[in-house]
């Protein structure tokens, strides 16, 4: 098995993964995100600000953030609108006609 050890000056203790993530958040990354992890992996200095100095649960796990930073997501196309939506848009938009007050078919001429 693997254990995680936290060392601060002369103090050392074993920590679980959740506590390790909060400690990393508190001491090394101010609200690390996918981009912060990616930058850290590339060797860039990462800094930012967080309102929760003790860490918080909204920070994703370091393992998840590192994985998402390394794997590029597939680009997905948005779904096509329904036929109903397409026909609503087509029929509800006013048609512009040059120099006429109304359509000939609407006037009965």
Curated annotation (Swiss-Prot):
Cell location: Host cytoplasm; Host cell membrane; Virion
Name the segments for region: Multimerization: 68-81
Q: Where is this region: Membrane association?
A: 88-89
Q: Which UniProt keywords apply?
A: AIDS, Host cell membrane, Host cytoplasm, Host membrane, Host-virus interaction, Membrane, Metal-binding, Phosphoprotein, RNA-binding, Ubl conjugation, Ubl conjugation pathway, Virion, Zinc
Query: GO:BP terms for this protein?
Result: viral life cycle
The listed location of motif BC-box-like motif is 61-70
**Induction description:** Expressed late during infection in a Rev-dependent manner.
Segments traversing the membrane: none
Q: Where is this region: SOCS box-like?
A: 68-97
Q: How is it modified after translation?
A: Processed in virion by the viral protease. Highly phosphorylated on serine and threonine residues. Thr-13 and Ser-82 are phosphorylated by the mitogen activated kinase MAP4K1. As the HIV-1 replication can be activated by stress and mitogens, these phosphorylations could be involved in this process. Ser-61 phosphorylation may inhibit elongin BC complex binding.
How this chain sits in the membrane, per its record, is:
Peripheral membrane protein
Q: Locations of Basic residues compositional bias?
A: 93-103
Modified sites of kind Phosphothreonine = 13, 105
Q: Where is this motif: HCCH motif?
A: 25-56
Which cellular component, as a GO term, is one annotated location? membrane
Locate the Phosphoserine modifications and list their residues.
61, 82
Residues marked Cleavage in virion (by viral protease) (site): 67-68
Q: How does it assemble?
A: Homomultimer; in vitro and presumably in vivo. Interacts with viral RNA and Pr55Gag precursor; these interactions mediate Vif incorporation into the virion. Interacts with the viral reverse transcriptase. Forms cullin-5-RING E3 ubiquitin-protein ligase complex (ECS complex) by interacting with host CUL5, RBX2, elongin BC complex (ELOB and ELOC) and CBFB/CBF-beta. Within the ECS complex, Vif interacts directly with host CUL5, ELOC and APOBEC (APOBEC3F and APOBEC3G) substrates.
Q: Which family does it belong to?
A: Belongs to the primate lentivirus group Vif protein family.
Q: Any extra remark in the record?
A: Required for replication in 'nonpermissive' cells, including primary T-cells, macrophages and certain T-cell lines, but is dispensable for replication in 'permissive' cell lines, such as 293T cells. In nonpermissive cells, Vif-defective viruses can produce virions, but they fail to complete reverse transcription and cannot successfully infect new cells. Vif-defective viruses show catastrophic failure in reverse transcription due to APOBEC-induced mutations that initiate a DNA base repair pathway and compromise the structural integrity of the ssDNA. In the absence of Vif, the virion is morphologically abnormal.
Name of the protein in its database record:
Virion infectivity factor
Task: State the organism of origin.
Answer: Human immunodeficiency virus type 1 group M subtype B (isolate SC)
The UniProt gene name for this protein comes to vif
